[in-house]
């Protein structure tokens, strides 16, 4: 018995008997645990019809506590055995503020999410439109986190980069009977009307993308707005992001922020550009040249509605870059059957007007949230090292300068030069961890190169797996050590052997079974193997 129950009882009786007067009450307390309340309802019509059973049911329901209703909801949802187990764990877990805002039936959904949390999965979420606000642009996000609350300074930029405007946030701690403490953070947000169409489908994509951002598998930037505004997946948005990173390296003056705003203004064009890329490199059914030309013309037709010349130039450059792209590993999967966490693009830079001189014959650009790298090659038979660069903004310029110098040196060794470089984007400050991260980034870079390079088996060229090729056979890829990678050659050769690459431990010079290139005047044994085949 409490005041809230007494007031609700008064309301039920007043409504049942259509009374406008205040319902009077007297409460009697005894030495037992029970209390008795006598109510007096004054009515103007003694002949009013009423249903005693309905009144009793309403009073019984009113007397049930939030915890009682939670138990019933858990039993109905999970069955008797599991429901009772969850009830024992969660019956006293929620704070009063939570119970005042959340219905017991909704708490069951939250409990299901809380039960998914463990040491390997510390974040779960719900993203939904409240029924009572279905006609507005309000959406809700509930984040469930194990052990500790999420810092607003961490999550707010992520949500804003998805184009969401946070208008309210409420944290709740959940203290279970087994001593565990988890947290629920409930956000109210405004979403652009473009993101309201087919909300269920977009919701699933948003949850997957936000989970990837939280785990550092997806970058936290404005390209993520296209998940809600353009209907892209987080991985599809990474296609546009990868090309934006490449644009930066070839000296295009537009900032990434400006490119992001261009596509935010024209999300339907962003979707068409991604579709052009997907159709060109689809493994199952790559589009014909005629179809690709038609898709390109459709994008150009959209430019009639693009008023800003800079936006026009950016969109045209994206089409140029996709046309110039010869191969990608975008549709490859790893040993676990998941799409790879990095994107490799083999590009013919002579087809891109913005590329500075000298223009390589081919280049491979590797992008991931952890590492970016480029491998420039001025011919099919080329040699050169891979450098661990610290010039994140212009490492391609550094590599291009090195390869020009290499070409002069190579006139007495191998006809043309090549050079590669990569930058690590999430380097820790501790020395040992710093080196380890550098090695892991190097591995990603090497895998990115090998993913889209053909192999040779029994003297025959074997095309790269799950790669749609828009160029001739190309199985020539040799690397060497350079600044920062002097001790990495065995790592590269190990990956080459893992890929069953035809050069094996000749892939990278300087390893434990490679040649001493300084003594012998060569950079890579593999380069000579390539010459033999030419």
Question: Which sequence ranges carry the predicted segments?
Answer:
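Non-catalytic interaction/regulatory segments
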Residues: 1-164, 168-372, 380-393, 433-437, ...
């Amino acid at each position: 018995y409490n005041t809230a129950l007494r007031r609700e009882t008064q309301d039920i009786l007043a409504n049942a008997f259509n009374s406008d007067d205040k319902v009077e009450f007297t409460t009697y307390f005894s030495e037992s645990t029970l209390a008795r309340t006598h109510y007096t309802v004054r009515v103007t019509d003694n002949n009013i019809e009423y249903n005693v059973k309905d009144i009793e049911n309403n009073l019984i329901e009113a007397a049930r506590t939030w915890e009682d209703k939670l138990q019933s909801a858990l039993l109905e949802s999970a069955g008797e055995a599991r429901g009772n187990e969850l009830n024992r764990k969660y019956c006293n877990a929620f704070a009063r503020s939570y119970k005042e805002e959340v219905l017991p039936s909704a708490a069951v959904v939250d409990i299901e999410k809380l039960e998914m949390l463990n040491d390997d999965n510390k974040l779960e979420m719900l993203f939904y439109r409240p029924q009572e606000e279905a006609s507005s642009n309000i959406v809700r996000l509930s984040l469930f986190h194990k052990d500790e609350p999420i810092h607003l300074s961490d999550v707010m930029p992520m949500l804003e980069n998805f184009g969401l405007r946070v208008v309210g946030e409420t944290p709740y701690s959940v203290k279970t009977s087994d001593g565990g403490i988890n947290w629920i953070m409930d956000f109210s947000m405004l979403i652009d009307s473009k993101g309201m169409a087919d909300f269920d489908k977009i919701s699933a994509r948003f949850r997957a993308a936000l989970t990837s951002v939280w785990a550092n598998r997806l970058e936290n930037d404005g390209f993520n707005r296209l998940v809600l505004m353009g209907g892209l997946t987080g991985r599809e948005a990474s296609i546009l992001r990868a090309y934006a990173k490449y644009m930066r390296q070839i000296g295009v003056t537009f900032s990434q922020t400006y490119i992001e705003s261009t596509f935010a203004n024209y999300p339907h064009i962003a979707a068409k550009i991604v579709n052009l890329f997907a159709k060109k490199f689809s493994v199952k059914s790559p589009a014909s040249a005629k179809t690709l030309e038609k898709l390109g013309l459709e994008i150009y037709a959209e430019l009639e509605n693009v008023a800003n010349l800079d936006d026009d130039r950016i969109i045209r450059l994206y089409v140029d870059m996709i046309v110039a792209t010869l191969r990608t590993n975008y549709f490859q999967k790893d040993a676990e059957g998941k799409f790879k966490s990095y994107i490799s693009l083999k590009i013919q830079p002579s087809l891109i007007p913005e590329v500075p001189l000298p223009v390589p014959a081919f280049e491979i650009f590797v992008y991931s949230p952890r590492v970016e790298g480029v491998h420039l090659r001025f011919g099919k038979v080329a040699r050169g090292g891979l450098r661990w660069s610290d010039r994140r903004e212009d490492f391609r310029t550094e590599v291009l300068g090195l390869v020009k110098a290499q070409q002069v040196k190579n006139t007495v060794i191998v006809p043309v030069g090549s050079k590669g470089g990569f930058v690590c984007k999430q380097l820790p400050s501790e020395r040992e961890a710093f080196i380890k991260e550098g090695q892991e980034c190097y591995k990603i870079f090497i895998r990115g190169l090998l993913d889209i390079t053909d192999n040779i088996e029994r003297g025959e060229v074997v095309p790269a797996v799950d790669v749609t090729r828009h160029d001739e056979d190309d199985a020539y890829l040799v690397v060497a050590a350079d600044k920062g990678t002097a001790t990495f050659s065995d790592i590269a050769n190990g990956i080459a052997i893992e890929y069953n690459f035809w050069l094996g431990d000749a892939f990278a010079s300087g390893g434990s079974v490679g040649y001493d290139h300084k003594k012998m005047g060569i950079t890579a044994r593999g380069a000579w193997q390539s010459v033999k085949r030419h």
